[in-house]
Amino acid sequence: MFDIHSHILPGIDDGAKDLNESLALLKIAQDDGITHMVATPHIHIGRFNNSAKALNNDIDVLKQEAFNAGIDLKLAVAAEVRLDIELMAMVMAGQLPFIGALDSVNYLLLELPHSHVPQGYDKFINWLSKQNIKAIIPHPERNRDIQANPFYIERLKQLGCDFQLTASSIEGAWGDTAKAISIDMLQKGLVSYVASDAHSVKRRPPLLSNAKRLVTDLIGELEAQHLFVNNPQRLTESLFDE
């Protein structure tokens, strides 16, 4: 399986606190059947001011430490980027780490605030599209505005966005509403990816296998294979080829 959303780089956001926790997270992922993992630390202007250059250095260090620890996982780096008007300057300067490219279009893991869908979100996503950037919206099922007004899902889809569900939402870890939205989106064929959004060993570990079983029961083995393997593999091919 491919996990395209995780916070496994140590000490740079609200994910792994240190190298020991990073390695523990990688071991959990490996034991769960994950073969490829993309570190997607937050880029949230004013809170987590991570840069593409620094992240590339950080992933190189983690790759070496994982190798030294005998962990056999393919690792790559991108970012989970918070929607903010100030991102425009970073886009124009070529400073955003994309999570992949398909058919010459760059893909960006674009996070909405957890509490709401910001005003002007549609204009910003349209602007990204004009820059040859397609947004993947992570964990839409956990956004409070979307929970209250599911029509946002339809609007985001109309804008060309793809969706990535959190594996633990499908299991019910984020509440009944997030689970119900996840199931509804899966049944309607609105989901392109499922990922762990791993942050910590105890509370938010990188586990996908149980969610994959649930998705298989819900929409079939072939569709589950697309969400957990085929789609993320195709998306991130350029990251793992580097």
Spans of model-derived segments:
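An N-terminally biased module of ancient metal coordination in phosphate/nucleic-acid-related enzymes
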Residues: 1-71, 154
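Non-catalytic positions within long, well-ordered alpha-helices that form the structural scaffold/packing
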Residues: 30, 129, 157, 186-187
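Active-site environment of divalent metal-dependent phosphoester hydrolases
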Residues: 44-47, 82-84, 142-146, 170-173, ...
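Extended substrate/RNA-proximal surfaces in nucleic-acid metabolism proteins
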Residues: 49-164
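Short loop-to-alpha-helix "cap/lid" segments that border enzyme active sites
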Residues: 175-184
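Short acidic/histidine-rich active-site segments
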Residues: 190-206
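Mid-to-C-terminal alpha-helical segments outside catalytic/metal-binding sites
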Residues: 208-209, 213-242
